[in-house]
Every structure is written in structure tokens, then in C-alpha cells.
Amino acid sequence: LLENITDIADKTDFVVFKNNIENGGIIKAINVKGGASLYSRKGIDKLTDFVKKYRAKGLAFLKYTDNNLSGSIIKFLNEDLQAEIIKNTKLEDGDLLLIVSDQESVVNQSLGNLRNHIAKEQNLTNDEEYDFLWVIDWPMFEYKEEHGRYFSLHHPFTTVQDQDIDLLDTDPGKALAYCYDLVVQGQELGGGSVRIHETTLQ
């Protein structure tokens, strides 16, 4: 899972986290089980280069070994914050926590792809098994900073969910679409949506 640790990160004195949160960003982490011994600092540097392909500016890390946390941001974490992170991310001895701080779309894309990359690298996936997934409650829009505006995430003809109509004027990034997709092994098999059929909404 991509664990949202924004609330915890906001309590630190780490300027990168603070500035990102003030600008509407989030901080999420993935727990690589047993990863502390699998990835040296050089290995983590390679993972950092990987997430940069998805517009992430960097990758923070914490290793949990012998009941102690160590890593690139440990000096910004007092004992209480360390305990919160361990609890909220379900860290166990030997685990590695990888953290990205950025805008939500960048965080989700970079960490999601990093998770898949590590799974393949460590032979954690089984190509003989098929896991089907229905994707629902997909966001209507994504804000792209390089263009300075919102873009449709499904297609521009999809209608907004009833409870989110007012968000189109106030916070379009939080509005959800009436659409669905069927995915297997990360590949989309098919999907559909309710089209915009009200003149006033169009």
C-alpha cells in the first residue's frame, strides 16, 4: 500500500516536507518488507533515479533494524514521530521505508511504479496468477503544473458524480467521475462511463 504519512511529516522540521505541504502536496511511503538488507545506499540511489523518471524530485528512506530507525531524514524525527511512523507504516525489523514528497499525482505515480519495479526486481510477482481489479471513483481531473490547468483523467465526456457537482467550481481536483475500468496485471481490459447528458452541466 501507499501509506499517507502527511500528518506525521507535517510535525517534523524537515523543510522539504513543510514547503510541500504548504503548497498543497502530500507525503506517502511504501514499506519494502525485508528491504533494509536488500538495498544499500547505492541501491537506494538507483531507486531515486527511477522515481525521478516520474517527476519526483527525490526519495527519502528509513531502515528499521534492531528496533532502531536510521536513514536520510532520521535527524528530523524525534522519538514520538519515529514511533508514529513505525506504527502507521507497520514497520518490522529489517524493513525499508521509501518516501516521496510532492504533488499528489506525482507521489502516486512515482511510488506506484516504484512498487512494481521493486516487486519485479525481487521476483515477488507471479505471472501465472491473474488478479482482476475494478477501478471506480476515479478523479475527474488532474492538475498539470507545466500547463497551469486541469485535464480530464478519463475523457472529457465523462460526467461528474452527483455529490461532487459543486466541486467543479470550488475544488475540481477532488471531484469524482462516473466511470469504471477493469484491470488485470496492470493492463486495462475495458471500461465505461456515464456520459454528460445534461445541457446545464455541459
Regions found by a protein language model. Name each.
Residues L1-Q202:
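Class II aminoacyl-tRNA synthetase catalytic cores and aaRS-like
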